[in-house]
């Protein structure tokens, strides 16, 4: 049920790419369109409006005449950064692209791990079998 909801919000071709384009901070429409190679302006407009309705993006006017907006992620939108990193790493492995997500400081390919904030440690390999989805 939770996965179905998540996919209903972010499960089309462009939505996660729009969110990923906003992970580094607010963007104006033109900047975002340029960064998302191949997206039609009407598709970007539709996605941004829907993401705003879904509470993942916040639009802030930076010009009144004409009205122009800058787009930024809400807290809920920023929460998707981990999912985007996981999907990006998976895509890199499937396509043989050695340039999956990299650590900004040293350039090493990032790995994703399950982590328990209560125990303050990563889940061990044997523990993963006991994972429950709540």
Summary of predicted features, one role per range:
Residues 2-39:
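N-terminal helix-turn-helix DNA-binding core of bacterial DNA-binding proteins
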Residues 27-32, 80-90, 99-101:
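Extended, folded domain segments that form the structural surfaces/walls around functional sites
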Residues 29-62, 66:
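Canonical helix-turn-helix DNA-binding module
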Residues 16, 54, 83-95:
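Alpha-helical linker/hinge and terminal dimerization helices associated
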Residues 89-134:
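C-terminal regulatory/oligomerization modules of transcriptional regulators
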Residues 7-9, 48, 72:
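Basic, helix-initiating cap at the start of DNA-binding domains
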């Amino acid at each position: 049920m939770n996965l179905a909801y998540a996919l209903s919000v972010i499960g089309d071709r462009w939505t996660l790419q729009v969110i990923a384009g906003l992970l580094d901070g607010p963007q104006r429409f033109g900047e975002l369109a340029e960064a998302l190679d191949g997206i039609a302006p009407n598709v970007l407009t539709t996605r941004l409006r829907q993401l705003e309705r879904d509470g993942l993006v916040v639009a802030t006017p930076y010009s009144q005449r004409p009205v122009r907006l800058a787009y930024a992620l809400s807290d809920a939108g920023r929460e998707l950064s981990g999912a985007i990193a996981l999907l990006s790493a998976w895509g890199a492995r499937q396509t043989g692209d050695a340039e999956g997500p990299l650590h900004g400081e040293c350039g090493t390919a990032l790995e994703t791990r399950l982590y328990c904030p209560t125990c303050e440690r990563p889940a061990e390999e044997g523990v993963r079998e006991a994972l429950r989805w709540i």
